[in-house]
Amino acid sequence: VNLSESIPASNIDKSLTGLMWINPFFKKSPLEEITILNEAKVILEQTNYEIMVHTHYLFLDSITKKNLNYPNRSFTLDGASMPIEGNKYFIHYRNFLLKKIKKNDIKAVYFFKHENFSQKSITNYIDHNCLEKVENKLFYIYKILCLK
């Protein structure tokens, strides 16, 4: 990553004034990523129901007016941030996740398309019959159909 190609993070939100933005996944086009994040902020804030977002952009919760109900502080599928099937804590995590979804009346789980984030972070824990996958320009969205 060439840090001289970074651009002011205040283009994402004024609270990020003084910081510079560049990401290894958008190292040649940080403005493209910022455009995606700004469009995402609008989409997320206009959602009129409770959502959960699985993303590496954990700061989004602090720059939107929407509670994004992150289930974890990080997201990996190697068992480090959430137990994988076969792990002795898998059922405990599954119960934690389902309880959080029910308690917060989550209606959908969002994944940024460009992150190529494994959707197993939700599909491994919720019965496939309870999920309906849809998408828009920026997100894969799993509507939760039967957890009330």
Regions found by a protein language model. Name each.
Residues 67, 130, 146:
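Functionally engaged cysteine thiol sites
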